[in-house]
Regions:
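Cytoplasmic helix-loop-helix junction between adjacent transmembrane helices
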Residues: 107-145, 312-313
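Residue-level signature of mid-helix packing/kink "hotspots" within the transmembrane helices
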Residues: 58-66, 150-151, 249-254, 339
């Protein structure tokens, strides 16, 4: 992979960017295994409340996404990236004192704000570090931190819940982003365009954002309700379905990450949509968690192609000083997908 052969300090900065992102998404991934037992156990809530925690997270991320994009263009990706870790850690800390649904909603909102800042700034940073003909691959490789965290987080949290207790899993929500924040000290960052950056959002990013909304719905269905669904269907194993999805996306980013640059963003996006529909259909009818893992693997591979392909559509026609705003609009589609899917899937469950 050409990106791995970039000269220092860009190569070092790219590796550190991925490792820092892993810490943030490890915490976010862990929360998906923690919320269902917390809501239905200690808080005495329902599946609908679980669904609304996803929606609150998504709405907070959506609203914060636009401010994060403008902040990246005007104040720099480094600052916005660091702020994201701070919000994730603060939201995780509230899990320890969540005695009712309202406090949990606030915690999830803070995590959503943190995700918006961290994810948008991280993508902008990755694109800056990569050569133009490898931007799709750079987005894919940055996605390694996302999907490694989302695959390892639920499994790690579930193991801690099963063998130690819910309180032990909640520590992941705080410690992981704090360590990530410390790890990014001194990293090479992109320049700040405070004078040339505007206050509007590029139109070129709106259509790719709508396509990404579909991916958000699929992901919300898997990571938000796999635990509850397979507790009912098969007596457990939902966390492993989430893990299979994240692991497949992780591997797909490595093996397939070059395809958007080689095949083109449009052709790659169409293929990804087709396979995503096949995968989610398998999960929908699977009677056992291990069969659902097959569908999750297909969905994960499709997502590993869909996200960078659509991202390339969003940034290729956008000037460098507006790239943060463009990626903010684009990734907002992901939040919209989560916001729509949360209450819908909660009522279906």
């Amino acid at each position: 992979m050409e990106l791995l052969h970039l000269r220092s300090p860009r190569r070092i900065a790219f590796a550190r960017l991925i490792l820092a992102g892993l810490g943030g998404f490890l915490a976010l991934g862990a929360s998906y295994a923690i919320v269902p037992p917390l809501v239905k156990g200690e808080l005495g809530g329902t599946d609908v409340i679980v669904g609304w925690t996803i929606t609150v997270f998504a709405i907070a991320a959506l609203l914060a996404r636009f401010g994060a994009g403008l902040g990246i263009d005007r104040r720099g990706a480094r600052l916005v990236y660091a702020v994201g870790f701070g919000f994730i850690a603060l939201g995780g800390a509230l899990f320890f004192v969540a005695q009712n649904d309202s406090v949990l909603f606030v915690a999830r909102a803070l995590q959503g704000i943190g995700q918006a800042c961290m994810f948008t700034a991280g993508l902008t940073w990755a694109v800056y570090l990569a050569p133009k003909h490898r931007r799709g691959q750079a987005i894919s490789l940055f996605g390694l931190s996302v999907w490694a965290g989302l695959s390892l987080g639920p499994v790690a949290a579930q193991l801690l819940i099963d063998h130690v207790g819910l309180w032990a899993a909640e520590w992941l929500l705080v410690l992981a982003p704090i360590l990530a924040l410390v790890s990014m000290i001194g990293m090479l960052g992109p320049p700040v365009h405070s004078e040339s950056a505007g206050m509007s959002f590029p139109r070129e990013a709106f259509r790719p954002g709508l396509g990404l909304m579909f991916g958000g719905v699929v992901m919300a269905a898997i990571v938000g309700f796999a635990v509850l669904t397979f507790d009912f269907r098969d007596g457990g194993g939902g966390a492993y379905v989430i893990g299979a999805y994240g692991a497949a996306t992780f591997v797909g980013r490595i093996v397939l990450g070059h395809l958007p640059d080689r095949l083109g963003s449009y052709r790659t996006g169409v293929l990804a949509f087709i396979f995503a529909l096949i995968g989610i259909s398998i999960i929908g009818v699977a009677p056992t968690w291990w069969l659902a893992c097959v569908g999750a693997v297909i969905c994960g591979a499709a997502w590993s192609l869909l996200f960078p392909a659509l991202a390339l559509m969003a940034i290729d026609r956008t000037p460098a000083h507006r790239r943060g705003a463009a990626l903010a609009v684009y990734t907002a589609g992901f939040d919209l997908g989560f916001a729509v899917a949360g209450p819908l899937m909660g009522n279906v469950a």
